[in-house]
Amino acid sequence: MNPHIPSIPARYYLRLLPLLLEREMDLTELFQLLGTDLSSYVQQEDAKLSLAQIETLVSYLLKFAENRDLAFELGRSLKLNAHYLVGYALLSCENVMQALGVMSQYFSLIMPNFRLKVTELTNVVVLDIHPLQAMSTLTLNFHLEAIAVGFCSSFAELLNQNVKPYDIHLSVFQPTYVQALQQLKPAQFHFGTLIRPSIKIFIQADNLDTKLPKADAFSLNILEQQCREQLKQISLDGEIIDWISMMLR
């Protein structure tokens, strides 16, 4: 586990606000526990949350029975544009295999406390997504579920809904909203099949060579450069924080 993970983009969690308001939840107590009014972050593209705030958010919301499907709803809302530069870079790729490589390279810009590793085998590609930072079981499982569902949403959009069957294995046990996962076919979910907390996605070769409709090599080059600059800035910010911490000891 890596303790030096930068703060996490707030943009994903902000997507829960409309749903919570639709469910007529009073968020006053939650905002007090977080020490901030999340709704004020909506217009801040680079707003961040600490892991402690995310732990508080998840544990508070999942206390309510009506919110047991929040991971599913959050994941389902994650279209490619939710990932900003990385999402647009994926859309600009030539084919699925190239897109998976780009996703792996810049996954820390999407979810910095998780890692995506892509392994190419005979006739199949395996995506391994696992945490880089220690967190409570409740928070970890929430994120694993949301990331898995979010992948389905983004993958279907990337292929313009022309997706062939593929398999998603998770370490978490079957959730109460399992019937809702039928909406994500042809993805097939397999729960409780992994020992290590993680997700493994198996994509067959017949999905990999699919040409993407918005492929644009010029745009991809520019977007990747911007992604690299963001990674460099995050690394620099981390070094500055480490230096300040050292000086204050």
Segments predicted by a language model, with ranges:
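Long, highly charged amphipathic alpha-helices
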Residues: R15, T56, Y60, Q98-V102, ...
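Surface-exposed, interaction-prone regions with an acidic/low-complexity signature
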Residues: P3-Y12, N123-V124, H130-S136, L140, ...
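Extended mid-to-C-terminal alpha-helical interaction segments
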Residues: L181-R249
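Solvent-exposed amphipathic alpha-helical surface segments
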Residues: R23, R68, I110, L158, ...
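N-terminal low-complexity or simple alpha-helical regulatory segments
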Residues: M1-V125
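N-terminal regulatory/effector-sensing and dimerization cores
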Residues: S50, Y84-D206
